[in-house]
Structure formats: structure tokens, C-alpha cells
Amino acid sequence: MLKKTLAALALGSALFTAGQAMAADYKIDKEGQHAFIEFRIKHLGYSWLYGRFNDFDGSFTFDEKNPSADKVKVTINTNSVDTNHAERDKHLRSGDFLNVSKNPTATFESTEVKANGDSADITGNLTLNGVTKPVTIKAKLIGQGDDPWGGYRAGFEGSATLKLKDFGIKMDLGPASQEVELLLSVEGIRQ
């Protein structure tokens, strides 16, 4: 009887530990330049203008078997906006757009993750230009596995569309430029 009890306890402990090991915390790898927060907006309806934020930090919890337990948290230095054009970047930092002197950071914190086939909808609160609104990011796992340095990584891509006026950006760029698309590529290192 004692052997059966010990065996049951060992099996139960192993299953409990295995279940816990599924969820893992990751730090976004910005130091290795394996993560990007980019955006694009139509320029007069004729072409796309691309930009990015060069300075951000974040983390996520990833459990492939239980996406509802996943979490994402990111902080962006809005002063790091970069469209490869100094005068435009200066204008984007002004009160017409990001107002970085008043709002030096933008943040995203997830509130819910729902699996949707081979992708997921990550809903959370985005604070941009001092305004907080719910946003849903359409995300997809690119891959995961061991890296050559003894670590473990997971990579995702995602996108979301934001209406500028929803975040208090009143500068009118014309009817074709009322929305901005966020384009995300994130690789995290398991902690």
C-alpha cells in the first residue's frame, strides 16, 4: 500500500510540475535587435510612410497549451520615434502627434489572450499620447526552440490598426491617413 501511495504521489508531483513548466516568462530581446515595433500610415493615399520606435522594453508569459494564461507588457520610449527623416521625426514628437514632452512613454498591457486557430487575439490597454484605449493585436507564433547560447526563445509577429483621433491625435493628415498600422516582430528569451 505504501508503494502505491508513494508512486501516486510521485506521478502527481511530476504531472503538477510538468503542467507548471508549460507557462514561461520571456524578456523581449531588444539588445540583440531581435524585436521591432514599426508602424505605417498612408501618405496622401499614394504610398506608405514607415517608421519605428527604437527604444522599448517588455516581457511576456507564453503557454502554448493554455493561451488564456498568456500575458504581455511593453513600454515604449516615444521620443525614440524614427522615420528616417529628422524634420518629420521632430514634428511627430511635437504636440501635434505624440507630445513626448508630456507623454514620454506609451504602454501596452494585455487583459486577455484568445486562441484563434493558428493565431491569437491579444487584447489589452494601450496608453498613447496620454489616452488609454482597448486594442486587439492579431498575433501569430513564428517559432520557438533552443538557441546556440544555451537559452530558449519564442518569436511572434503581430499587427493592429489604430485610429489617430482615438488617442487624441487631432492633426488631420487627410481622409486616407486617419489610421496607423502597427507592425510587431518580437523575439523573447525565456527567463
Swiss-Prot record:
Q: Which GO terms describe its cellular component?
A: extracellular space; periplasmic space
Keywords, A to Z?
Periplasm, Signal
Q: Does the keyword tRNA processing apply?
A: no
The keyword Coiled coil belongs to this UniProt entry's keyword annotation: no
Q: Report the domain of life of the source organism.
A: Bacteria
Q: Which SUPFAM superfamilies match?
A: YceI-like
Transmembrane segment boundaries: none
Q: Please give the chief subcellular localization of this protein.
A: periplasm
Q: Gene3D superfamilies from the xrefs?
A: Lipid/polyisoprenoid-binding, YceI-like
Where does this protein reside within or beyond the cell?
Answer: Periplasm
Signal peptide start and end residues = 1-23
Q: Name one Pfam family in it.
A: YceI
What family does this belong to? Belongs to the UPF0312 family. Type 1 subfamily.
HAMAP family per the UniProt record, alphabetical: UPF0312
Protein name as annotated: UPF0312 protein PA0423
